[in-house]
């Protein structure tokens, strides 16, 4: 039996204050059913970051995984772009 393809999302890290956890904001373009206008929706996901390597502002790829805690069902796959530190 094959495992189904897991969901993958791309977003920006908005919080890294927890130990081994990051909060990733993912933006989705959705068309309004009645007014046919494109709306940008933002959803936040808590993701597991084993080595605490992601920082605020980084662009990251997260993948769905087994439940790690009450709110965490995603894990960090890779950091695609580092935030610019001023």
Curated annotation (Swiss-Prot):
UniProt xrefs under InterPro entries: NA-bd_OB-fold (IPR012340), Ribosomal_uS17 (IPR000266), Ribosomal_uS17_bact/chlr (IPR019984), Ribosomal_uS17_CS (IPR019979)
Keywords, alphabetical: Ribonucleoprotein, Ribosomal protein, RNA-binding, rRNA-binding
Gene Ontology MF terms in the entry: rRNA binding; structural constituent of ribosome
Entry-linked CDD domains: Ribosomal_uS17
UniProt KW Cell cycle keyword: no
HAMAP family cross-referenced by the UniProt entry: Ribosomal_uS17_B
Annotated function: One of the primary rRNA binding proteins, it binds specifically to the 5'-end of 16S ribosomal RNA.
NCBIfam families from the UniProt entry: PRK05610.1, uS17_bact
Assembly notes: Part of the 30S ribosomal subunit.
Protein family per UniProt: Belongs to the universal ribosomal protein uS17 family.
Protein name, as recorded: Small ribosomal subunit protein uS17
Gene it is expressed from: rpsQ
């Amino acid at each position: 039996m094959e495992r189904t393809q897991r969901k993958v999302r791309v977003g920006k890290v908005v919080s890294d204050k927890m130990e081994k956890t990051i909060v990733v904001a993912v933006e989705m373009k959705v068309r309004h059913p009645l007014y046919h206008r494109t709306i940008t929706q933002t959803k936040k996901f808590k993701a597991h970051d084993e080595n605490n390597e992601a920082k605020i502002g980084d662009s990251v790829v997260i993948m769905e995984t087994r439940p790690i805690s009450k709110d965490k069902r995603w894990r960090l796959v890779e950091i695609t772009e580092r935030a610019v530190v001023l």
